[in-house]
Amino acid sequence: MRKFCTVAFLLATAYTAVAQQGIGVFDAATNVGNPAIQGKVQYNAQTQEYTMQGAGSNMWFNNDQFQFLYKKIKGDFIISATVRFLGEGVNPHRKIGIIARDQLTANSRYADACVHGDDLTSLQYRPIDDANTEQVTLSVFHPNHIELERRGDTFYFSAAVHGEHYKTVSKVLPLNEEVYAGLFICSHEEKVVEKAVFSNVRVIIPAPRNFTPYREYIGSHIEVMDVQTGLRTIVHSAANSLQAPNWTKDNQLLYNSEGLLYKFNLANGAIQKVNTGFANQNNNDHVLSFDGKQIGISHHAGEKRTSTLYTLPIAGSDQPKQVTRDTGHSWLHGFSPDGKKLVFTGWRKNQYDIWTIDIATGKETQLTNTPTLDDSPEYSPDGKWIYFNSVRTGTMKLWRMRADGSNEEQVTFDEYNDWFPHFSPDGKWIVYLSYPKDIDPTDHPWYKKVYIRLMPAAGGVPKTIAYVYGGQGTINVPSWSPDSKRIAFVSNSKL
């Protein structure tokens, strides 16, 4: 039986009091070290934010006092959050962050991702019970986004100012297999209470290190993010693989799961299977026409399981219309703005290039011709350009060309491997996915730490807007809201 959780059913109670067990995704809150003033936590289920209040003399030397919102976790994990203090504060050494401890005692071994009120950002740790705290400093000042990861006996602290990429430090520290892990706040003053807000909180149980891609899967969260504010909310979760949401004109999310397409209603959380007839082996390359009336799908057809393109009405159909023939894999990425063509990555002439096909006549037109991989093509809303990603320089970067294939030019230039450029409906922005440089540039694997990035369509410096555990299936297809204010995507965790 699959486990499902939809945020629509949680909105009846907007706030959770500290006395309650089960606060958001955490088990409980407690005051470690018996601070003179007891802390508390409020959880806003609508925004999925935690407001923490806490006192405490310090988290240093051999004794800690702080407010702790935790859950017990075994093995590897990643906890991430967007953090901010409320108010100017009293002591510049007030601190907030993410922590993992053996015990709830004041002298327990621990490792944390700690942000101070001043410029200090550090991975703090106590190597044995009763020992003095030590630290590894991180050269990020006043970060907004933080992450604590456990991988075996090594803890990694990553942090970034909004818009930038993570910087990371690490420490080998063999804590218990099961730890208390979560969020903390300490005022550094016994008689002072400080406040902080933790948003975009994710508790991630990653895929096993030896998992088999495309055979073994972990759970999925469908998320919606306000591009301007950066606030992310999980709208639907499942223990199986959900992939690649599109955003329909009537505010539903169209996504793939196990070869089928489903619509998720953002207003009420209802899920409806889309009728695709015989096409029941669809991959995650599905798109909507610009007018929102048609769906394009990529179905693995025949004995060869060739990825083949079809179109059907947005309401579904028993008989999707076949567009490409059995001439090699075709991976769909978009309609032309006039709805007359599809643009796709095609295996033709023993290589993958960018092609278009006339839906009415079936005539294919080759637009790129390189021995290296060109992929993920998408029309600009005005129809003048096609953006895509190419590994022709040795790194997967964004490129663009005229709609007829002329004037190819590179668009992004940094060290990351960039995939899946998607235009906002108003034509002003491009959002895309970036893998770190140690990932094979020809691959977009599952279950990696990736960035969702944003750049002006007119050109400019990209900025990171989301720090995500995902990759394949996260944002393969266009997922902007019709008003160009939000995007949908998939993140992953074992659920």
Residue ranges and their predicted role:
Residues 3, 41, 148, 254, ...:
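Assembly/interface hotspot detector across virion components, adhesins/toxins, and nucleic-acid enzymes
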Residues 207-495:
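Sequence signature of WD/YWTD-type beta-propeller architectures
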Residues 20-211:
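Extracellular glycan-recognition regions
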Residues 1-21:
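Bacterial Sec-dependent N-terminal signal peptides
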